[in-house]
């Protein structure tokens, strides 16, 4: 009985914690740099296994390289609130692009390389790619814009 009570309490606390993530912790969202041509935006959630695999690779690539005209951002979908996700996308100037990409089904665990002038998703990076492939995808996207 105690085991059932403990499991139920843990599940409820976890669910409540995910539903009430404050905006300040929900996303790393700032406007892209003025000279940015490409926005590399990670669709992320703390419960997403693909995110946990991809995020450290993206961070390592960011730290090891300088990409002219590329701004990195993360939109956190941990709370599973589409309204909050799309509000953060609007802050980045890519609300329309994200709505066209996802519709009602937001997918996490991918880095979207978006041309800020056209709103086009140039390329998508996923967890299967190593750091060299991620670097190449970002470099190629920057060269196209």
What are these regions (language model features)?
Residues 1-7:
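Sec-dependent signal peptide recognition
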Residues 67-91:
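Thiol-based oxidoreductase modules, predominantly thioredoxin-like and allied folds used
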Residues 17-19:
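Bacterial signal peptide processing site
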Residues 12-15:
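C-terminal motif of bacterial Sec signal peptides marking the signal peptidase cleavage site
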Residues 52-66:
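Typically the conserved alpha-helix immediately C-terminal to a functionally engaged Cys/Sec
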Residues 105-145:
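Non-catalytic, surface beta->alpha helical segment in thiol-disulfide oxidoreductase systems
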């Amino acid at each position: 009985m105690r085991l059932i009570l403990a499991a139920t309490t843990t599940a409820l606390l976890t669910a409540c914690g995910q539903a009430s993530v404050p905006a300040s912790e929900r996303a790393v969202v700032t406007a892209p740099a003025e000279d940015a041509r490409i926005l590399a935006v990670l669709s992320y959630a703390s419960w997403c296994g693909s995110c946990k695999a991809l995020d450290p690779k993206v961070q390592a690539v960011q730290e090891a390289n300088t990409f002219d005209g590329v701004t990195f951002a993360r939109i956190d979908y941990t709370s599973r609130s589409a309204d909050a996700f799309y509000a953060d996308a609007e802050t980045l100037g890519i609300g329309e692009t994200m709505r066209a990409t996802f519709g009602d089904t937001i997918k996490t665990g991918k880095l979207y390389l978006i041309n800020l002038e056209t709103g086009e998703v140039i390329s998508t990076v996923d967890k299967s790619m190593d750091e060299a492939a991620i670097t190449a995808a970002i470099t190629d996207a920057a060269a196209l814009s």
